[in-house]
Curated annotation (Swiss-Prot):
Belongs to the lambdavirus holin family. This is Antiholin. The chain crosses the membrane at residues 38-58, 71-91. GO terms for biological process: negative regulation of cytolysis; viral release from host cell by cytolysis. Residues 1-37, 92-107 are cytoplasmic. The keyword Cell wall biogenesis/degradation does not apply. Keywords: Cytolysis, Formylation, Host cell inner membrane, Host cell lysis by virus, Host cell membrane, Host membrane, Late protein, Membrane, Transmembrane, Transmembrane helix, Viral release from host cell. It comes from Escherichia phage lambda. It is found in: Host cell inner membrane. Residues 59-70 are periplasmic. It is a multi-pass membrane protein. One of its GO terms (cellular component) is membrane.
């Protein structure tokens, strides 16, 4: 029995290669940062996974913002370095500023 061709699967994997590399870079940086700062293993892995998920979509966000998608790798490393706590606080401050609230940290 002959196995069917797997060209579609290979094409799908190769199409996501750039995003996968960015996610791996963000995961590695977040994991190393968390372990260096003395974080617990579980918390570090969860934070690194969330950074990888954010970094997976960074190329699309850069395109949306009109920036070069060549910045995706360094942006992924930056995402891993600052972590999800910092990203969350940046989003909260931005939303509070847009909503006209004076202090977005108390919400």
């Amino acid at each position: 029995m002959k196995m069917p061709e797997k060209h579609d699967l290979l094409a799908a994997i190769l199409a996501a290669k750039e995003q996968g590399i960015g996610a791996i870079l963000a995961f590695a940086m977040a994991y190393l940062r968390g372990r260096y700062n003395g974080g617990a293993f579980t918390k570090t892995v969860i934070d690194a996974t969330m950074c990888a998920i954010i970094a997976w979509f960074i190329r699309d966000l850069l395109d949306f913002a009109g920036l070069s998608s060549n910045l995706a790798y360094i942006t992924s490393v930056f995402i891993g370095y600052i972590g999800t706590d910092s990203i969350g606080s940046l989003i909260k401050r931005f939303a509070a500023k847009k909503a006209g609230v004076e202090d977005g940290r108390n919400q």
